A protein has these predicted regions:
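N-terminal secretory/targeting leader peptides
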Residues: 25-131, 140, 147-262
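Short, low-complexity disordered leader/linker segments with a strong preference
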Residues: 1-43
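Short beta-strand-centered segments that line the small-molecule binding cleft or hinge
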Residues: 134
């Protein structure tokens, strides 16, 4: 199977692995043959920083399953969750270099690499997650975003989501003044940090793998994530309250290295 056919199969997979899912090292080839035919086989890694029991993992695994099915078993994608291949920044860098062809991750860390992805970082823009999905599913919007990723050295294959991000804390929040001084963990995203700073909180960028122990040791007072992430990582063991800020949708992108794609 040549590269053009491989790319075509990936594009077909994209149609099966979009937002509807949430509502419900380089190429390594080996050749094996018979007297009748010779089959080229391929294997590639897909990296993610998310835990295994999340929509992100389900999205990645579904993509891998469809690639294998549509290729008749000649293409295999191995999914590596939990930052096994690196954190968000490292995954983006490795993907751009072509070392890790596929990455599934939240869009927030991508602002440093592609500033126009900040369109997803405008707080309080949407009232419902259905609104978010309607906009992201819009073909014109998708075309614009695909160009953004292409210009950044990637190709965008699709989006999924984990709902809205909410805040957890050990301090009861009943009005805006209650945000003041709270050390809240954020991702390394200037727009996220500006939002919490304007509420009077003290935003503290931190790698997600350090959040639980940060809450345990008092390095941070609060954090913000979608419910699924909070539950799967047992952050409720260190936090007393959930504040349904619903300030941002948590979008997940499936991207591929442009170098690999070409």
């Amino acid at each position: 199977m040549n590269r053009k056919k491989i790319v075509s199969a990936m594009l077909i997979v994209t149609l099966t692995c979009g937002l509807g899912l949430t509502a419900c090292g380089g190429a390594q080839g080996s050749v094996s043959g018979t007297e009748e035919a010779e089959v080229q086989r391929y294997a590639w890694p897909l990296g993610s920083s998310s835990p295994e029991d999340t929509v992100t993992q389900i999205y990645a695994e579904k993509f891998a399953e469809e690639v294998e099915r549509l290729s008749g078993g000649s293409m295999k994608i191995s999914v590596y969750p939990n930052s096994v291949l690196g954190g968000d920044r490292e995954l983006l860098e490795s993907c751009k270099d072509g070392d890790i062809p596929f990455v599934v991750q939240n869009t927030a860390p991508q602002v440093t690499f592609m500033k126009d992805t900040a369109v997803f970082d405008m707080p309080a823009l949407f009232e419902t997650i259905d609104e978010v999905r309607e906009h992201v599913d819009n073909p014109e919007f998708m075309e614009l975003m695909q160009q953004v990723y292409h210009d950044g050295g990637y190709e965008l294959l699709g989006y999924a989501d984990q709902g809205f991000r909410v805040m957890t804390t050990n301090k009861k929040v009943e009005n805006l003044s209650d945000f003041k001084g709270q050390k809240i963990r954020t991702m390394e995203n200037s727009y996220h940090m500006a939002y919490w700073k304007n509420l009077g909180a003290s935003p503290t960028p931190m790698t997600f793998s350090e959040v639980y122990i940060g809450l345990q040791q008092g390095t941070i007072d609060a954090q913000e994530n979608p419910y699924e992430v909070i539950v799967s990582n047992k952050l409720y063991e260190q936090q007393d309250y959930v504040v349904e800020t619903n300030h941002l949708p948590h979008l997940i992108s499936l991207i591929v290295s442009e170098e690999f794609f070409d």
